[in-house]
Amino acid sequence: IEAMLATGQRIFGENRVQEAQARWTARRAEHPDLELHLIGPLQTNKAKEAVALFDVVETLDRPRLAGALADAASKAGRTPRLYVQVNTGEEEQKAGVAPLEADAFIASVRRDYGLEPEGLMCIPPAGEPAGLHFALLAKIAARNGLAKLSMGMSADYEIAVLFGATSVRVGSALFGLRP
């Protein structure tokens, strides 16, 4: 991380709130221009900590979490930028809103919780052509007026860029696989 910071890298993603707190709290004081993205699942009971630490939460995927984030943001006086996670492969083991429910969920987040998502995020199923999932995500974003697309990881980020990714998650290419 220190080597990346020395090169000027300032946008980092984290999978877990507690790990991020340990890793970034002191570094934020040293590097006030850091931008932290939560790219892993967020438990509702961690919404307060996530709002305090992260600039972007990319894993908004259920009404209860939207409510918890809205409450935490109101109390903290700051709202992180939000992405709705779409489970484009409709995999049971993955988080995210089903593609057919995405429009209604985005509308509900806006209407019922007063939150304005700025983009969408997806993780395509392993073994399937990623481009199909990226195209689907881009289509959902376009019809909902969302400009940001977080899609593509170390193995498929080039394809994601071709389909309009505005950010990619390439941590394992830079830092190696998680232990």
Model-derived features with residue positions:
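Conserved alpha/beta-domain cores
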Residues: 1-155, 161-163, 175-177
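Conserved acetyl-CoA-binding loop of GNAT-fold acetyltransferases
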Residues: 164-168
